[in-house]
């Protein structure tokens, strides 16, 4: 949250069973917490999106390497950030930048706005950064993902609501200066906390599937992992999240209880 970053070898990360204490990956400062991790190689370009709606781009090898117990380096020493800025989301650029025309990039903001652009719009970013998205007062970018037209978008809120809609029904914006359009109808004091992209696989609307259909559904099944602030989680089949129109109120994804 306070803008520190580092890179390390995947060899230092081991698979563990659920429910364990885990292993130290980074030492955090007071009231700081880890918000995002990526798996990249040293030649991958990484996009950094700021709370002010700007985007920066650097190669992964320029991020200082650190041990599991190190605190990392401040992003202010790596990117030309101003004092009031912080990074809200990071995203790896496809390794083959020539393929950027095949993909789109989706933005989601805390106030429920979404926007889709061609990834080509972000292939050339100078060292001083570029405008990625205009934001309303008190709004901020909470997630940025790469997607294709045959995938769906899922937005999740602080109060446990979710909405799923087709990416192809969200038009591609031609510029980077738009504020986007409504992705979900938020309740008072609620806000978007997560943006996810999943494959567009659905059950038949009449609910009747043949044996072959069911085998194919099982093979294509994906799962949504919902984790609460206090560390409780649940795994749900993506078939349980029906596809609706963008801008609706969504469904309950996880109960927002005092325990969670």
PLM region spans:
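Short, structured "edge-of-domain" segments at secondary-structure transitions
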Residues: 1-260
């Amino acid at each position: 949250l306070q803008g520190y970053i580092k890179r390390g070898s995947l060899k230092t990360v081991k698979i563990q069973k659920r429910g364990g204490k885990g292993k130290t990956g980074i030492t955090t400062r007071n009231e700081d917490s880890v918000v995002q991790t990526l798996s990249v190689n040293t030649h991958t370009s990484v996009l950094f999106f700021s709370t002010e709606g700007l985007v920066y781009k650097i190669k992964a090898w320029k991020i200082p390497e650190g041990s599991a117990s190190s605190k990392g380096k401040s992003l202010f020493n790596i990117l030309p950030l101003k004092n009031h800025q912080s990074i809200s989301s990071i995203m790896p650029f496809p390794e083959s930048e020539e393929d950027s025309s095949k993909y789109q990039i989706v933005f989601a903001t805390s106030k429920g706005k979404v926007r889709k652009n061609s990834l080509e719009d972000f292939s050339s970013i100078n060292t001083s950064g570029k405008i990625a998205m205009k934001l309303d007062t008190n709004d901020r970018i909470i997630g940025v993902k790469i997607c294709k037209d045959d995938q769906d978008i899922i937005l999740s809120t602080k109060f446990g609501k979710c909405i799923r809609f087709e990416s192809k029904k969200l038009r591609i914006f031609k510029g980077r200066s738009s504020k986007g359009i409504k992705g979900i109808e938020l309740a008072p004091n609620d806000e978007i906390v997560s943006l996810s992209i999943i494959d567009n696989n659905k059950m038949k609307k009449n609910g009747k599937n043949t044996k072959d259909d069911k085998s194919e559904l099982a093979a294509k099944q994906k799962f949504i992992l919902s984790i609460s602030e206090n560390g409780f989680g649940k795994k749900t089949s993506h078939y349980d999240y029906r596809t609706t129109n963008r801008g609706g109120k969504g469904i309950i994804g996880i109960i927002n209880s005092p325990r969670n």
